[in-house]
Protein backbone atom coordinates (compact mmCIF):
# COMPACT_ATOMS: atom_id res chain seq x y z
CA UNK A 1 0.00 0.00 0.00
CA UNK A 2 1.15 3.54 -0.74
CA UNK A 3 2.94 5.27 2.17
CA UNK A 4 1.10 8.56 1.64
CA UNK A 5 -2.26 6.76 1.76
CA UNK A 6 -1.34 4.99 5.00
CA UNK A 7 -0.01 8.23 6.46
CA UNK A 8 -3.25 10.01 5.59
CA UNK A 9 -5.25 7.16 7.14
CA UNK A 10 -3.18 7.18 10.34
CA UNK A 11 -3.54 10.96 10.65
CA UNK A 12 -7.29 10.57 10.16
CA UNK A 13 -7.43 7.87 12.84
CA UNK A 14 -5.57 10.26 15.15
CA UNK A 15 -8.35 12.80 14.58
CA UNK A 16 -10.96 10.20 15.50
CA UNK A 17 -9.21 8.36 18.36
CA UNK A 18 -6.98 9.83 21.05
CA UNK A 19 -5.32 6.45 21.57
CA UNK A 20 -5.17 3.07 19.85
CA UNK A 21 -4.06 0.28 22.15
CA UNK A 22 -2.28 -1.87 19.58
CA UNK A 23 -1.24 -1.39 15.97
CA UNK A 24 0.25 -4.26 14.01
CA UNK A 25 2.14 -3.81 10.78
CA UNK A 26 1.27 -6.90 8.81
CA UNK A 27 1.65 -8.11 5.27
CA UNK A 28 2.32 -10.11 3.19
CA UNK A 29 5.67 -9.78 4.86
CA UNK A 30 6.36 -6.32 6.34
CA UNK A 31 10.12 -6.91 6.39
CA UNK A 32 10.05 -6.81 2.57
CA UNK A 33 8.85 -3.21 2.65
CA UNK A 34 11.81 -0.90 1.97
CA UNK A 35 9.93 1.92 3.75
CA UNK A 36 9.27 0.02 6.98
CA UNK A 37 11.32 2.50 9.02
CA UNK A 38 9.23 5.39 7.64
CA UNK A 39 6.04 3.55 8.62
CA UNK A 40 7.28 2.88 12.16
CA UNK A 41 8.35 6.49 12.72
CA UNK A 42 5.14 7.91 11.25
CA UNK A 43 2.88 5.64 13.32
CA UNK A 44 4.77 6.41 16.53
CA UNK A 45 4.63 10.15 15.80
CA UNK A 46 0.86 9.92 15.64
CA UNK A 47 0.30 7.30 18.34
CA UNK A 48 3.36 7.51 20.61
CA UNK A 49 1.93 5.25 23.33
CA UNK A 50 0.51 2.52 21.13
CA UNK A 51 1.80 -1.02 21.39
CA UNK A 52 3.34 -1.15 17.89
CA UNK A 53 4.21 -4.57 16.52
CA UNK A 54 5.63 -5.99 13.31
CA UNK A 55 4.05 -9.34 12.47
CA UNK A 56 6.38 -11.64 10.55
CA UNK A 57 7.03 -15.31 9.92
CA UNK A 58 10.62 -14.57 10.93
CA UNK A 59 12.44 -15.83 7.85
CA UNK A 60 13.90 -12.42 6.98
CA UNK A 61 14.91 -11.52 10.54
CA UNK A 62 18.32 -13.15 10.15
CA UNK A 63 19.21 -10.39 7.66
CA UNK A 64 17.58 -7.47 9.46
CA UNK A 65 19.52 -4.23 8.99
CA UNK A 66 21.23 -2.34 11.77
CA UNK A 67 19.13 0.73 10.91
CA UNK A 68 15.87 -1.18 11.25
CA UNK A 69 16.99 -2.73 14.55
CA UNK A 70 17.84 0.73 15.88
CA UNK A 71 14.46 2.09 14.74
CA UNK A 72 12.65 -0.83 16.39
CA UNK A 73 14.45 -0.23 19.69
CA UNK A 74 14.15 3.56 19.60
CA UNK A 75 10.40 3.34 18.96
CA UNK A 76 9.67 0.51 21.41
CA UNK A 77 8.38 -1.83 18.70
CA UNK A 78 7.76 -5.51 19.36
CA UNK A 79 8.39 -8.23 16.79
CA UNK A 80 5.54 -10.79 16.67
CA UNK A 81 6.89 -13.96 15.11
CA UNK A 82 4.38 -16.48 13.81
CA UNK A 83 6.38 -19.70 13.91
CA UNK A 84 4.95 -22.20 11.44
CA UNK A 85 5.85 -25.92 11.63
CA UNK A 86 8.50 -25.90 8.86
CA UNK A 87 10.38 -23.06 10.59
CA UNK A 88 10.39 -24.21 14.22
CA UNK A 89 14.00 -25.45 14.18
CA UNK A 90 15.30 -22.29 12.50
CA UNK A 91 13.89 -19.72 14.91
CA UNK A 92 15.99 -20.24 18.04
CA UNK A 93 19.11 -18.55 16.68
CA UNK A 94 17.11 -15.68 15.18
CA UNK A 95 15.21 -15.07 18.41
CA UNK A 96 18.45 -15.23 20.40
CA UNK A 97 20.04 -12.61 18.12
CA UNK A 98 17.05 -10.28 18.52
CA UNK A 99 17.02 -10.62 22.30
CA UNK A 100 20.77 -9.91 22.41
CA UNK A 101 19.97 -6.65 20.60
CA UNK A 102 17.28 -5.89 23.25
CA UNK A 103 14.43 -6.30 20.76
CA UNK A 104 11.14 -7.28 22.34
CA UNK A 105 9.90 -10.52 20.78
CA UNK A 106 6.56 -12.30 21.03
CA UNK A 107 6.43 -15.86 19.71
CA UNK A 108 3.23 -17.42 18.46
CA UNK A 109 3.65 -21.08 17.63
CA UNK A 110 1.32 -21.96 14.81
CA UNK A 111 0.67 -25.67 15.19
CA UNK A 112 -0.92 -26.09 11.80
CA UNK A 113 -2.01 -24.15 8.77
CA UNK A 114 -5.66 -23.15 8.92
CA UNK A 115 -7.68 -22.84 5.74
CA UNK A 116 -9.62 -19.69 5.07
CA UNK A 117 -13.18 -20.75 5.65
CA UNK A 118 -15.16 -19.51 2.72
CA UNK A 119 -18.34 -21.14 1.68
CA UNK A 120 -20.82 -19.83 -0.78
CA UNK A 121 -23.74 -20.41 1.57
CA UNK A 122 -22.15 -18.62 4.52
CA UNK A 123 -24.41 -20.25 7.04
CA UNK A 124 -22.86 -18.42 9.99
CA UNK A 125 -21.62 -15.03 8.78
CA UNK A 126 -21.69 -13.41 12.23
CA UNK A 127 -19.57 -16.21 13.67
CA UNK A 128 -17.09 -15.77 10.81
CA UNK A 129 -16.77 -12.07 11.57
CA UNK A 130 -16.48 -12.68 15.30
CA UNK A 131 -13.71 -15.21 14.73
CA UNK A 132 -11.87 -12.80 12.44
CA UNK A 133 -11.56 -9.95 14.91
CA UNK A 134 -8.44 -8.07 13.89
CA UNK A 135 -9.51 -4.61 12.77
CA UNK A 136 -7.84 -3.83 9.46
CA UNK A 137 -7.08 -0.47 7.89
CA UNK A 138 -6.74 -0.20 4.15
CA UNK A 139 -7.18 2.69 1.74
CA UNK A 140 -9.36 4.73 4.06
CA UNK A 141 -11.53 1.88 5.33
CA UNK A 142 -11.72 -0.11 8.55
CA UNK A 143 -13.05 -3.67 8.53
CA UNK A 144 -13.15 -6.46 11.08
CA UNK A 145 -11.60 -9.00 8.74
CA UNK A 146 -8.79 -8.78 6.15
CA UNK A 147 -10.80 -10.91 3.73
CA UNK A 148 -12.92 -7.86 2.96
CA UNK A 149 -9.89 -6.35 1.27
CA UNK A 150 -8.37 -9.47 -0.28
CA UNK A 151 -11.26 -11.60 -1.51
CA UNK A 152 -11.33 -9.93 -4.91
CA UNK A 153 -7.68 -10.90 -5.49
CA UNK A 154 -8.47 -14.49 -4.54
CA UNK A 155 -11.45 -14.56 -6.88
CA UNK A 156 -9.54 -12.96 -9.77
CA UNK A 157 -6.43 -15.11 -9.48
CA UNK A 158 -8.03 -18.45 -8.71
CA UNK A 159 -11.22 -18.18 -10.76
CA UNK A 160 -13.41 -18.31 -7.67
CA UNK A 161 -16.66 -16.55 -7.14
CA UNK A 162 -16.72 -16.14 -3.37
CA UNK A 163 -19.11 -13.48 -2.23
CA UNK A 164 -17.53 -12.43 1.02
CA UNK A 165 -18.82 -9.05 1.94
CA UNK A 166 -19.17 -7.36 5.26
CA UNK A 167 -19.44 -3.85 6.45
CA UNK A 168 -16.41 -1.70 6.15
CA UNK A 169 -16.27 1.80 7.51
CA UNK A 170 -15.02 4.77 5.53
CA UNK A 171 -12.92 6.75 8.03
CA UNK A 172 -13.28 9.93 5.98
CA UNK A 173 -17.08 10.14 6.21
Q: What residues fall within each predicted segment?
A:
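A general structural motif
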Residues: 18-22, 49-51, 74-76, 102, ...
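Conserved alpha-helical substructure of the radical SAM core
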Residues: 1-54, 62
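A cross-family glycoside hydrolase active-site/sugar-binding cleft signature
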Residues: 24-26, 53-57, 80-82, 108
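Acidic (Asp/Glu)-rich catalytic clusters
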Residues: 12-17, 67-75, 97-98
